[in-house]
Curated annotation (Swiss-Prot):
Pfam families: RraA-like (PF03737)
Superkingdom classification of source: Bacteria
Keywords: Cytoplasm
Protein name: Regulator of ribonuclease activity A
Annotated compartments: Cytoplasm
Function text: Globally modulates RNA abundance by binding to RNase E (Rne) and regulating its endonucleolytic activity. Can modulate Rne action in a substrate-dependent manner by altering the composition of the degradosome. Modulates RNA-binding and helicase activities of the degradosome.
Length: 166
């Protein structure tokens, strides 16, 4: 389904939060949306791997990596796992790696920056907790909408019917 965050802002500005423009798009899909699942972890992706093994249909994984860009939280293997399990997208407040492979995986990915260094693989962190970055507080089960223009957040799903005809 087509979405346009600029159009959604024009229609729903009083009902949404707009994330500060600090993210770049890296995955094979430039637009994605869904109900968020949150993870808070630091330079460690073991818990991320566990969550991505779940059915992700209609879901977006939102990772609060503390804004650290010294180690990548998402690589091609994790992105492929997410795509294989139906995840709509991944947003990383941190770094990713293996950009050439990520571009060919059918999943939306937004992150702060790339770096070639991988992360630890211990399952340390928290899931389904509120996280705050980009000027917005994200709660589990909020709805997120992302495209090349930006990222917006809503407590309730937005009506996307009019975009079906575009």
């Amino acid at each position: 389904m087509y979405i346009d965050t600029a159009e959604l802002c024009d229609i729903y500005l009083d009902q949404i939060d707009v994330v500060e423009p600090i993210f770049s798009s890296f995955g094979g899909k430039s637009t994605f949306f869904g109900k968020i699942t949150t993870i808070k972890c630091f330079e460690n992706n073991g818990l991320i791997s566990e969550i991505l093994e779940e059915n992700g249909e209609g879901r977006v994984l939102l990772i609060d990596g503390g804004g650290a860009v010294r180690r990548a939280l998402i690589d091609a293997n994790l992105a492929q796992l997410a795509a294989d399990n139906g995840w709509e997208g991944i947003i990383v407040y941190g770094a990713i790696r293996q950009l050439q492979q990520l571009e060919n995986i059918n999943i939306g990915i937004q992150a702060l920056a790339p770096i070639p260094v991988g992360s630890d693989e211990q399952s340390i962190g928290e899931t389904d907790v509120p996280v705050n970055f980009g000027g917005v507080t994200f709660f589990p089960d909020d709805y997120i909408y992302a495209d090349l223009t930006g990222i917006i957040l809503s407590q309730e799903p937005l009506d996307l019917e009019e975009f079906d005809s575009l």
